Amino acid sequence: MAVLLRRHAWAVGFSGLVAIGCSPSTHNGGRVRGEGHGPPSPVANGGAPDPSGFYRQIGMIAQSGSFPFVGQLRYLAGSSADSTLSLVTLSFANRSLTFTGDAGAQRAAYTVTLDVTQGTTTVRHVETHKQIRVASFHETQREDESVIFQQFLSLAPGAYSLSVSVRDDGGGNANVQQMSVTIPRLGPHTLSTPISVYQVKPRVRLDTVPALIANPRSTIVLGRDTLAGLYVEGYGLSTSARVDVAVLNDAHVVILRDTVNLVRQGDLSSALLDFPVASIGVGPVTVIASLASATDSVQAPLFLSFGDEFGITSFDELLSYLRYFVSPQRVQLLRDTPPDQRAAVWAAFWKQTDPNPSTLENEALRDYFKRIATANTRYREEGLAGWLTDRGKVYVTLGEPDQAGQQFGTNTTARGRAEIWVYTQYNLRLIFINQSGIAHPRLSSSSQADFDKLVRRLQSQ
């Protein structure tokens, strides 16, 4: 029986296969995601503290720098009691790669190297070379999750060191993460670690691998995804086995409980733990699963956000993004919400600010976060995210100006240059003055006052 978590269409299929403990060149998986799956990340553009440290803290694979990537290590039972099937998943952006023209399209190549060691002994070395091809230059500049890599490894239970290296073959970008890992033994009456997936077809034999497309970032995009899904397997269980599930928010408060029946097929049982996004709220959550009446449990992170790479690591961080969307008083009311009421209060806020309740999306919030992403690209200054600059905050609040132009002083030099934005709808004319000569325009005092007055009026409506 196929279990499919339907989120959105995929433009390109797998360019390879996945296999257990494979040799380097043939049995590996990569996938290029289709266009239009959320805005570029404000995090990637400096819109919030780099979340890679937080990801590593909760056991994920993550690096920032010139070649940022995010991923996870998940475990399923192997073909024997002395083997565990370990799944390494990675996600990174097209923009990290160097593309060259190829018959009207764009092509890039990358290498992923996995080294598993115990002391001075190399237990597994896998070097995978992949190529991707996109249709246009525009796609090469994407900063959202564009490439998904996944690799299954068969390893004996025990303690290891894992090195994950990703390199752009066409340029100098590269990054590496080293981490200590403990591979569990998954015997009878145990569960696999849950795997966040875009789609999955469960396996029926332990000597095979499930046909799945992993979600390395475990990100659920509000307005796009209606369900948050995790694939889990059970071993040596009866046909009536069930899994108890609890979802905890970032304050460690249980916000959802459920019981899911495992489906027995062949040698093993499996289930898709899926939850309505509206019942969870927004921000990071932890999903804990255990066999009914058992004391041991497994867990996995999920991040409910507004884009694949938004990197929102707490409810408070989400609220910091809303400073130009609603009044400070309204943000504070959300901030003061007790942790066990956040999901309900956020659902009410979503409904109140949704201009078109007949759709699954909140178009106002969707467009607002898209403007944050655009502002980070256009208006970023050294040490300051684009959406927090003067031009950025105006753009995020009001959108594209109806007219925009530049005006120079009598000396026609960059110093004293003025940039003028006009918003006809609001009868507003804003002047940004660049006194530094290094493209850091600031609102004039009168324009700042006019803008603040308009913002107060809009936020009071």
Residue ranges, per PLM feature:
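Residues within mature, well-folded domains
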Residues: 252-254, 266, 279-280, 303-461
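Intrinsically disordered, low-complexity terminal regions enriched in Ser/Thr/Pro/Gly
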Residues: 23-282, 293-323
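Leucine-biased recognition of intrinsically disordered, low-complexity hydrophobic segments
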Residues: 4-5, 17, 114
